[in-house]
Swiss-Prot record:
Residue positions of the active site: 125 (for autocatalytic cleavage activity), 162 (for autocatalytic cleavage activity)
UniProt keyword list: Autocatalytic cleavage, DNA damage, DNA repair, DNA replication, DNA-binding, Hydrolase, Repressor, SOS response, Transcription, Transcription regulation
Site (Cleavage): residue numbering on this chain: 90-91
Protein's recorded name: LexA repressor
Catalysed reactions, as listed in the record: Hydrolysis of Ala-|-Gly bond in repressor LexA
Gene that this polypeptide is encoded by: lexA
UniProt enzyme class: hydrolase
Alphabetized Pfam families for the sequence: LexA_DNA_bind, Peptidase_S24
Length: 204
């Protein structure tokens, strides 16, 4: 990880190594670096190379004369802004979804799906699934679910997060907590699935 500014001489060395690599296809020797940047002492070049390595700008093998490798610049992580809605009760379905209280940014590489929103958890009914009070869940908007999915549901004017289960025999749908202190909730036609939980963010 690059964590420090470069001195003027270090910039010259990096620039020379890049140019040499582009022209020759392999890195320069210590002596060639000396000549390229106007230094007379190989030990001085060794010192600068050691600093560049510690700062994360190159990797090298001191036992080989041309074993220099520049560390490529990493592209900035692409972020996706999604609405962060108010608290959702994981213990009792007590809070309705309001307008987004704010937006939050998440790594697009981890959550490539579209139509996402986030909810902050309160309550403890999903602790056995590792969803704790204060966690932020990432939810993919969808109105259908499969057995075992953790869903956000709109229930009697309020919102809750539970595990979805539909009985294959009688068609009864339950929202099941992941905490033995709570009973499953049998849902009716007025219940609406708002989305499926696909991720979780936690601050320590």
């Amino acid at each position: 990880m690059k964590n420090s500014l470069l001195s003027h001489q270090e910039k010259k060395i990096i620039s020379f190594i890049k140019q040499y690599l582009n022209e020759n296809g392999y890195p320069p020797t210590i002596r060639e670096i000396c000549q390229g940047v106007g230094l007379s002492s190989p030990s001085t070049v060794h010192h600068h190379l050691k600093n560049l390595e510690s700062k994360g700008y190159l990797q090298r093998n001191p036992t080989k004369p041309r074993a220099l490798e520049l560390v490529a610049e990493k592209a900035p992580e692409e972020l996706l802004s999604i609405p962060l809605l108010g608290n959702v009760a994981a213990g009792y379905p007590t809070l309705a979804i309001e307008n987004a209280e704010e937006e939050m940014q998440i790594p697009k590489s981890l959550f490539p799906e579209k139509e996402l929103f986030a909810l902050r958890i309160k309550g403890d009914s999903m602790i056995e699934e590792g969803i704790l009070p204060g966690d932020v869940i990432i939810v993919k908007k969808q109105e259908v679910a499969e057995n075992g999915d953790i869903v956000v549901a709109y229930l009697e004017g309020e919102v809750t997060v539970k595990k979805f289960w539909k009985d294959s025999v009688n068609g009864v749908i339950k929202l099941i907590p992941a905490n033995s202190k709570y009973e499953p909730i049998i849902i009716n036609r007025e219940t609406k699935i708002l989305g499926k939980v696909i991720g979780l963010l936690r601050r320590y």
